[in-house]
C-alpha cells in the first residue's frame, strides 16, 4: 500500500503549516512507515493510506514519486 506522509523537515522546530511537506512511501502498515522514516529527523504530522481514485489523483501531480526506503 502507498502512504502519503505530511511532515516538517526539522523535528526540533515548532510545526508551521506553511512549511509542511509531503512524501509517498510504499509500506505494509503505518507502523512500517514510521519504522522506515525513523532514521530521518522528520516531525511526522499525519500518515494516511491512499488508493483508488485518491491515488489516481495524486499520481497526476508532477511531484508524485514513491520513495524507496
UniProtKB/Swiss-Prot annotation:
Keywords: DNA-directed RNA polymerase, Nucleotidyltransferase, Transcription, Transferase. GO terms for cellular component: DNA-directed RNA polymerase complex. One of its GO terms (molecular function) is DNA binding. It is an enzyme of class 2 (transferase). Coiled coil: none annotated. NCBIfam families: PRK13667.1. Belongs to the RNA polymerase subunit epsilon family. A non-essential component of RNA polymerase (RNAP). RNAP is composed of a core of 2 alpha, a beta and a beta' subunit. The core is associated with a delta subunit, and at least one of epsilon or omega. When a sigma factor is associated with the core the holoenzyme is formed, which can initiate transcription. This is DNA-directed RNA polymerase subunit epsilon. It comes from Halalkalibacterium halodurans (strain ATCC BAA-125 / DSM 18197 / FERM 7344 / JCM 9153 / C-125) (Bacillus halodurans).
Amino acid at each position: 500500500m502507498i502512504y502519503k506522509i505530511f511532515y516538517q523537515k526539522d523535528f526540533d522546530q515548532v510545526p508551521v503549516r506553511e512549511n509542511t511537506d509531503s512524501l509517498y512511501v510504499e509500506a505494509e502498515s503505518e507502523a512500517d512507515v514510521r519504522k522506515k522514516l525513523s532514521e530521518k529527523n522528520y516531525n511526522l504530522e499525519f500518515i494516511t493510506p491512499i488508493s483508488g481514485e485518491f491515488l489516481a489523483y495524486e499520481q497526476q501531480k508532477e511531484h508524485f514519486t514513491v520513495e524507496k526506503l
